[in-house]
């Protein structure tokens, strides 16, 4: 068996829920690319050791909890990622580690595909990590009326999000137009970020979690008559941009088919 020409992967903790290994390896196989994609579980305290060897890989995605802390180890950071303050993709070029944020494109893809315009809307976001920063950046850039963050630790969230003009509260209420989950709650069908909220017609529920595609939060909101947007579309959107950066192009139909196969395999 020939060794791969390119080694890509995902780092995070945990990574057991990720469909990336199935998606990208199937995509590479279908496109005839001699490449491999690995899932690598990296504890926060061992990130610095991994990064000392990271340039041996051709590129890797970054997920919770490393999207912010990884920026300290990179040689270059794309202007969009730097302005957001979060990196979810690293590419090795000429021995240098370059950081990008493809989540932003995934968020844009998800809202456009779902036919949701955030302009003039009052919005609450659960979470204050890297993906929350990216979502907030998108909302402000696209003229949301107001953005509130729901966080368990208000002081910590204020420190993390001090670059943004947002209100931070411990609880949400029924007064918002759009509710967005940017926490791991719902992964593997466990947890609800907005248990205190009563959903109904006219409200929109959005989840960045993609496994499962319909989380308990989205299911509850959908049953109540609210419009729902799945994190699976965010995943597809960011994967399109990821492949553009790592392989200089993306066959969108092949990618979407690979995602569908992966979702069916992990059910």
UniProtKB/Swiss-Prot annotation:
Residue positions of the active site: 67 (proton acceptor)
Amino-acid positions noted as binding NADP(+) in the UniProt annotation, renumbered to this chain: 127-131, 208, 231
Self-association and partners: Homodimer.
Name of this protein: Shikimate dehydrogenase (NADP(+))
Stretches of the chain forming a coiled coil according to its record: none
Organism: Thermoplasma volcanium (strain ATCC 51530 / DSM 4299 / JCM 9571 / NBRC 15438 / GSS1)
One GO CC annotation: cytosol
Gene3D superfamilies: Leucine Dehydrogenase, chain A, domain 1 (3.40.50.10860), NAD(P)-binding Rossmann-like Domain (3.40.50.720)
Entries under SUPFAM superfamilies matching the protein: Aminoacid dehydrogenase-like, N-terminal domain, NAD(P)-binding Rossmann-fold domains
Enzyme Commission (EC) number: 1.1.1.25
Keyword Amino-acid biosynthesis among UniProt keywords: yes
UniProt cross-references to InterPro entries, sorted A to Z: Aminoacid_DH-like_N_sf, NAD(P)-bd_dom_sf, Shikimate_DH-bd_N, Shikimate_DH_fam
Recorded metabolic or biological pathway in which this protein acts: Metabolic intermediate biosynthesis; chorismate biosynthesis; chorismate from D-erythrose 4-phosphate and phosphoenolpyruvate: step 4/7
CDD domains, per database record: NAD_bind_Shikimate_DH
Family (UniProt): Belongs to the shikimate dehydrogenase family.
Binding positions (shikimate): 63, 88, 103, 210
Functional summary from the UniProt entry: Involved in the biosynthesis of the chorismate, which leads to the biosynthesis of aromatic amino acids. Catalyzes the reversible NADPH linked reduction of 3-dehydroshikimate (DHSA) to yield shikimate (SA).
Xref: Pfam families: Shikimate_dh_N (PF08501)
Keywords attached to this entry: Amino-acid biosynthesis, Aromatic amino acid biosynthesis, NADP, Oxidoreductase
Single biological process term from Gene Ontology: aromatic amino acid family biosynthetic process
């Amino acid at each position: 068996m020939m060794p791969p020409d390119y080694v890509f992967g995902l780092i995070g903790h945990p990574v057991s829920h990720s469909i990336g290994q199935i998606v990208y390896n199937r995509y590479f196989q279908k496109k005839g690319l001699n490449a491999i994609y690995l899932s690598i579980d990296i504890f926060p305290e061992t990130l610095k050791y991994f990064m000392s060897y990271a340039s041996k890989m051709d590129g890797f995605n970054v997920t919770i909890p490393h999207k912010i802390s990884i920026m300290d180890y990179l040689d270059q950071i794309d202007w969009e990622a730097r302005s957001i303050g979060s990196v979810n993709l690293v590419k090795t070029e000429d021995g240098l580690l370059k950081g990008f944020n493809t989540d932003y494109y995934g968020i844009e893809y998800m809202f456009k595909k779902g036919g949701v315009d955030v302009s003039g809307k009052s919005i609450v976001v659960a979470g204050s990590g890297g993906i929350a920063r990216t979502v907030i950046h998108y909302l402000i850039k696209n003229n949301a009326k107001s953005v509130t963050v729901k966080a368990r630790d208000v002081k910590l969230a204020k420190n993390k999000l001090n670059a943004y003009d947002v209100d931070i509260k411990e609880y949400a209420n029924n007064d918002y137009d759009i509710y967005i989950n940017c926490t791991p709650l719902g992964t593997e069908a466990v947890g609800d970020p907005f248990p205190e909220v009563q959903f109904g017609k006219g409200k929109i529920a959005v989840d960045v979690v993609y496994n499962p595609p319909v989380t308990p939060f989205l299911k509850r909101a959908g049953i109540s008559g609210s419009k729902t947007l799945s994190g699976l579309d965010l995943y597809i959107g960011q994967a399109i941009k990821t492949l553009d950066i790592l392989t200089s192009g993306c066959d969108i139909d092949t990618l979407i088919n690979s995602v569908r196969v992966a979702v069916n395999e992990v059910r």
